[in-house]
């Protein structure tokens, strides 16, 4: 367009180009359609992109300074095309005056609209008819025609008129109507036509702005070049219109105008100034050509363009402009004036990367002065007058204060922008706010930069590759904008390389260009949804543009200076090469086909050869053009990486895979092979493919025979023929296994193949299934469930041994599995609906074998469970040992015809787990667990094994390596003991000291905390760098690895390992190193790196193909890998590493079975050398003890099949944990003693590695091998070897001292606390931590020093009597003093010796804590005879001859163990207890019952012993114990003076606690033998709970002992008992027992069913009267007993109880009184005895009758109450059922008196013993009922009055009352009293009615009684609750201390850890003080 300012073109380089600030508003899509012009002039305007397409302009530099301005970023275009291309405009700009304003823009808009008016847009009539709106004819006045020259003004005028006539018109329709009116108006308005002509003559609307000639020029200082495009103006107007319509809901753009005042200031740059970014790059040339269409029709313009082309051609010869970069329009287009255009250079700028942008707005027309200061106009912008004006800081304008709106009184402070700048933000853009970067994109530096015309990037010319010498002419596009698009979507970058840049390449921005200008990076790209065959090299810049995030991530991950190196070239010795060749043979390739090409193109660049091998074609589809695509599954890639390939693609093996697929499909879908499409894609085949077709061996799908071809009963003598093609050979035993499997399948017997690990169970299974398939017996489908880690190996074996199987591996993520379900399960369409897991709707299966993992069996059960499986194979079948597991339950729901289980460990020695395995295998045969366990109850081990073999024989086959591989190399295992390093010792001590409180807590620490401590100690034994504190301080070498010397010296194991590996490497051995901890493997990696050994590694994080690849690399012939690092758990399954012959177990697993599996990785088929196994164990550490205990526990699980014990073998109890933690700590804290330290020099290491060493001898039995595996190599240590004849099976934990940690760690802990306190600076003093709960011993005297403390532990029992000495000990004491001292030292040494091991084998016999079978039997017999052993068993007749050789400590430890076993839950038919001790037929119920009965008897005798004396007939003895009694009085009187209170060591109070406690247990079944008991049924129920009651009473009595008030009256007596000599011990013990026993019956004690009211009264009465003599005590007791006899009514029953009970109780009381009086008369001494049975037995009835007959003179001859007491006393003395011993004892002579008359009879003894037994059973029953009544009274039990039994009782009482109250009527009636007679008849009628009612009630009574809850339930005495409470820990520290006070002073040192509060503490309640009538007892050691 020509204009008056064309002459200023020569000054354009000096003028600053400005962009117009015209506002823009949004334009809705609805308004675009009618406004879009069809001519070429408006092609720049795209209605769809009206909001996005903005034209950016390049600004010229001025005064030689090439300054650029950054363009504003615009929004990304929604269209992908638009986002890739950008439009460029003519860059010609014109200077203009400052008065050029809005009018000029309006004229341009009018011109633009006029041009578009003739573009065929819809007219007003068209719009009205289309939208059904009413047209309004508008008359315009001349004034309106002159003023309405802009679309905006016209719209404001017309729109209200149109809207008034069409009130409901939609806004978009109204806009279109207004636009149509505007076009019509423009055609008729002459004013607009004139301006439009001027505009039209200028040429294109998008190139220059028209300026009318009559417009005045403004001064130069305010002149502004506003080059605005008419399409922008039109776009702005339409957007403003839409903005007004929508009431400014989307105010994205700011309108500008001088007359607008209400706009708020904005800090943002107006949108019109936003320049285009480099997103829409490539449509610029087209658009510019279109945009110039109108001007080309002008002849002047055509002439100018011709000149321009000639100039361009001349310039191209001179300027080296890259053709690739210059894709835009010519650099300069003419301005339509017809004058030649001056060529301009590409835009440059001076960049300053440190420049900060000014936040204030500045206008572009801001001229600068000479010194760079801005020049403002010197007159007011409003009034055009000078004077005092204020200057705008962002533009040249100036204003008077009064001319502003609103007026200002004073100039504003700070920077100020004028109203024009505030309103018109478009002109206020900061001058230097250029869109382009201020720094070079390559080097990030500033300076002179070359700016891209399509994006904000800027570059130095020398940073480009190749560099540019000159600035290119015209538009220049950077290498990023000019790079071509990618051929597809990149999926991943495989690798990169340096590539030489060709000379014709355009400039690049490669980062490597500075170092090497000739090199650029290229990346090897795997395309999305394309196979690896299509990978390509892509230049870096191309990838950087299209995938910036991908390349950034890759660059962060890899070194970008040196390309990564992949596998070495394939050679002939590489197994990978052989495998590839085998695959090639299968697909018919020549061995050398393109091998070099593939190696160079793919293998060296990180593409594995397997990824290029077609595994199979899984589906196909046909395109519309007839071509066929095939879905290809690639080898070793998941199914979701399958790709669609064309049939004609040059892919090796694809043609054969297609043939196989089509053959299989034809067979499965019953199609003929002719239906297969044979046409291939048109075009020339590659040479490779032609050769492939010619030379490949044709291999098609061969279906199996339709009918069986062989008999399954016929065995294979040799390998079957169908295996010959595989080239593999089966072992003879494997053929035998296959025969057995085939036979079992034919017979329908589900099987377990249980061959030992390494015998090839996988191969046998695969071959078995293959034989069924190939011989026509079964086509499948076969389901094989295996561990995930072994799945790849299984897949490989199927491929190798069963090549014709269609085996699919159902594994991977959900996408992979969806592909499998859709393509691999069936050929039928719609068999699976959608990608979700759903039911398979077909029975035509495509596959033969489906290989999957356990987890997917459960996850995808909806699909897999819908298939009818022919055979199920489960590898590692011990996963099915629990029927509660999800895998078991879901797999059990599958439809399976035959099951085969594979396991190397078929029996985990647990009947329940074995049953679950068999139940899964054969549900019909094994379905009753109880019956199954019952078959093995109470039978010997041999019988169990025999039955198991009979049961499992048809189902299981098990062969061992020793059975079938006699020529297999042997293995030797060595335990290598290693010393702790100095750093390890430091950390070991610190860990123990830090955890002192946990170790020394009252309960011995919780199991969880102890396990945590143990794990820390194990980590310390492995390496101290496993702790962060040590790792942080460790020295590191280059690369971040630990420095090798310090790393090795820090751990004793690594020192030895380093020496071993050097020699092993020199001898060409290969090593497996196992460790539990993956972090330890990390340290070993650093160690191996430092030693420069090559290695492989497998742990839990390496699975699937990565695992198998590592194994293959290690097993490859000639492999350089020397060491294989494995984690014990992850490396134990499905791994074959037979190329290694040395196994080092760095740290043993908790479960030794895992270690066995681990070293079986090397000792298996294929091993050619002897296998040496070295197990590192740190000496004197927790590790050594863990290994011992774990192995022994593992051995116990092999001793017998027993329930309730899992197969893990390493579940440690808390006591065992404590014992493990103690091991070796004492030596650790001693001063460094180098004498016993183990040092390995080179000679010792060589001897260790000598392969001629036998090591641990081979055993035929695995169990024996395990037993003997703990022998230590002789050279490994200087310490003594263990005795060979004693084989320790299990070391007990009972020999631990509760104060051990206090003695060992207290001083260290206190020192540590002080150090910590000092480190905290000033503050509160850290008080000494004192533990008051350590078994009472420590609490007794906390001021003792450590040495005294330790000495006390071993001196507690040094003064026991000689009766407990070993045989022959008496002779030593008969010698002189020297011999006596010698014997005493021997006794002390024997007592100080540690306890024997818990289990040991001596001479083939098992010993338990040193007790052989005979001694254990003797101990049990003593328990059954006397009940619980007393405290001083060594001084009583309890200690039988067989037990006298045991020390008291050993004896008490065995007692504690025995009682723990009694309270252990479990079935009596089990052969061992939980800790492995043989049960030996012990019946827990019978033993507990006997203990309880003996406790009841002992309690009853002790109750009346001090009244009745010790002799039944004192007249038979001259002096009946007068000296004894006097001595007792003296001792008691002497000890009464200093009474003590509080907690006392209550050795004598054990009787208190136990007497009532154990009195709970009634007799077992014999109690119900007594037929005379009228309440026989209830008695039976009581009998059932006998043992339970005894145990409850123990616990409750233990609680009683904890009450402080209970001890007040005990102390004098206890002290008396403590100081008594052995001669009078028993008498004193009797007194001591009686009084504390009565005192402990405190009414406040909860859960005390054993306490009678009379005993409570005794306590109350005795408190104010201290016992002065025994006689007084006896008198008191007699009185109290009589009173309590009367008080028995409320104690036996509540007020609601039966009256019969009350009556019987009162009768018993009367009898008691009478008996007492008789005894006093005859013997001159008191006698008292009673059993308050509540009338539930016939005892009191008998006593009444007998005492009536026992007239004076015949008291001894008639058996009555007195005889019963002495019978019980005799049983206490001589034991249960020892009738003859009792009769022969003179103390119980009264028992013989009633039988003197029968002496002459022949069966005299039989009569006598039968009577005694019957009588004793009656007494036993009475005692049991008495105890139960005590419980009922304590629990306040009352019968419900509405209960039928109670109503019957009430009626009986009514009858009784009625009869008794009317007895006189009978006499009066007989006397003839008629009124009395009448009354008598009424009474009799009442009695008859009552009796009739009672009769009917009695008939219902049996059913009612049957519903009564058992006695045990009503008395809250269930066995489980009793045992759980019995095993409960003590509630607090004081309770624990009081509990232990019942034991002898040193007993704490002999018990389990935490015995004070653990279950063992409560076992003491079984132990009453043992006393015998007539003897004095002594408690030694008190």
UniProtKB/Swiss-Prot annotation:
Biased composition of type Basic residues is found at: 52-62, 251-266, 354-364, 676-687
Carrying Phosphoserine, the residues are: 79, 83, 201, 204, 210, 221, 284-285, 292, 295, 299, 310, 313, 1691, 1694
Q: What is its EC number?
A: 3.6.4.-
Q: Where is the Chromo domain?
A: 488-566, 612-673
Q: Where is the composition biased (Acidic residues)?
A: 1-19, 233-247, 1364-1377
Query: Could you tell me which residue ranges the Helicase ATP-binding domain spans?
Result: 742-924
The protein's name: Chromodomain-helicase-DNA-binding protein Mi-2 homolog
Q: Which organism is it from?
A: Drosophila melanogaster (Fruit fly)
